[in-house]
Amino acid sequence: MTVKEHKVVHEAQNVEALHAPEHFYKSQPGPSYIKDMKQYKEMYKQSVEDPENFFGEKARELLDWDRPFTRSKYGSLENGDVTWFLNGELNAAYNCVDRHAFANPDKPALIYEADEEADNRMITFSELLRQVSRVAGVLQSWGVKKGDTVAVYLPMIPEAVVAMLAIARLGAIHSVVFAGFSAGSLKDRVVDAGCKVVITCDEGKRGGKTVHTKKIVDEGLNGISLVSHILVFQRTGSEGIPMTAGRDYWWHEETAKQRSYLPPVPCNSEDPLFLLYTSGSTGSPKGVVHSTAGYLLGAAMTTRYVFDIHPEDVLFTAGDVGWITGHTYALYGPLVLGTASIIFESTPAYPDYGRYWRIIQRHKATHFYVAPTALRLIKRVGEAEIPKYDISSLRVLGSVGEPISPELWEWYYEKVGNKNCVICDTMWQTESGSHLIAPQAGAVPTKPGSATVPFFGVDACIIDPVTGIELQGNDVEGVLAVKSSWPSMARSVWQNHHRYVDTYLKPYPGYYFTGDGAGRDHDGYYWIRGRVDDVVNVSGHRLSTAEIEASLTNHDNVSESAVVGIADELTGQSVIAFVSLKDGSSRESSAVVAMRRELVLQVRGEIGPFAAPKCVILVKDLPKTRSGKIMRRVLRKVASNEADQLGDLSTMANSEVVPSIIAAVDEQFFAEKKK
């Protein structure tokens, strides 16, 4: 591989842009919302040059208002007072449920794919309206009112969606806590948000295993007088679930007492719709605050224009409502547009690796949205299942959560999409609310490995991290920032606006700082590098850890890799690579030592001597969040001999791997340094 000058986005060299396959157009229920690149550019230009009129028109078109807004946009990033749709009033639940229930009562709203397929069910918009109203009635009878916070600790079942919409119906604020979090993590989030009510279930089911959900809630809330009521849904119906008299109430008993329709409460555009906690590098998790109108519009617009979603379509987002992906693209995005959403409780491997494809075949899903982590798993061990099912209904394949490598992109396109689908690699984050960089399906040609172009209103730019100056033109690399506000961006951190300003608005005054490194290629397409702290500067060479990781995973025996930079007295930083092998080897032996040397030489040969890892550490597994992201900051701390300063680990799914990683670093890195 030829090494390009470091400022050039070399991944884009000799990469041809792909236009939408013929199948995409033939299978559409209606014309594309954006027909071609020319129309995208015209709309994008208006969205950044005249956002007031552009988004004002879209807000009136896509949302129903109780009171019209008087001005579309106010405030600035500099002042941290971003405001959209001033003086307008609306209700999120009405926009997601009522208006569709009145127009198409029997249309599917939620398609539930349970852990055990025999438990599958479907909920129409009219039934969803009844369920949401009844749960809202229960909450209202308990004194929940506009502006109150309510915690939701439920697995990925329809009742999680019902609970969120019931809270929004009252103008209250939902704070969903992923049902895989520990009792301590739940406690921290409930207390920080000030939730007096928690909605949960008796037990959960995932991958054929039972999760003792209510037991976790009881443990987390032990001694917490703040919580006065807990509503418990019977997911499994198991006997012996402990219920505290005067605090715990069964969902089915309480909802039976309520009316089937409860009028929605009008909310101001800027009233908080929800909190969602995201883990910081250190300290306590941040409760990111999203507003009602701006967030809803962002969810609606990106779902419509990025995915080219029509009301007749079926969207399968394989993400949990405990994360922003589930909020925006399993709930609010599809439902505000009146599109059916598949709610998936299980895993891609249960009861076998054909599960995803059976779901798509059974419901004729048109859109599939999933994380690269799941795709890598299927590519490694489940690819043979794909041809067994008719998944020709698919039109758009989405990727979310991390940059997708060009190799995995092409596999997704060929093996899952059969070269008939558009691939939408989407870059966004909890704080953005909806897509920041993503192709508009059918209009924007795509490139394997590139998230492509900014969404409407996202005035994206590349900043030199050293000088803080915006880099003009194409073929530039730096950090990704946004020059002005967009409707769905987070407004604050719960009860800590200073933290919000310090984290996102202060690093580069006048810009929103995404925290991601990126390159803008010769065509103006964006290539996401990952977190800025995942960029390593070795002897003046800025190295993308993703590029080094790609080189490592090109080796036939490498399963996964993660690269971090640590301080180095000679070179400023040095590259440390953590690698898990397909054969599971991690202990020292002559073969393992040879493998470590071989991997160093591979990077040296493919990228250059300056990119060669100082050390390759073989581990059995890498630390990951519950959404599948590798926690590189944990690896960096361990490699920096700071294993006693790992910070917040509440989002880690496999904390049991940490001791073995520490041992591997001691054996393969620190011990060798002493020799």
UniProtKB/Swiss-Prot annotation:
Gene name, Swiss-Prot/TrEMBL: ACS2
Any one GO CC term of the record: cytosol
EC number: 6.2.1.1
Annotated protein name in UniProt: Acetyl-coenzyme A synthetase 2
PANTHER family associated with the record: ACETYL-COENZYME A SYNTHETASE, ACETYL-COENZYME A SYNTHETASE 2
GO molecular function, one term: acetate-CoA ligase activity
GO terms of biological process kind: acetyl-CoA biosynthetic process from acetate
Organism: Zygosaccharomyces bailii
Catalytic reaction list: acetate + ATP + CoA = acetyl-CoA + AMP + diphosphate
InterPro entries on file: Ac_CoA_lig, ACAS_N, AMP-bd_C, AMP-bd_C_sf, AMP-binding_CS, AMP-dep_synth/lig_dom, ANL_N_sf
Superkingdom, natural source: Eukaryota
Binding-site residues for ATP, renumbered to this chain: 401-403, 425-430, 516, 531, 542
Keywords for the protein's UniProt record, in alphabetical order: ATP-binding, Ligase, Nucleotide-binding
Binding site residues for CoA: 206-209, 325, 539, 604
Family: Belongs to the ATP-dependent AMP-binding enzyme family.
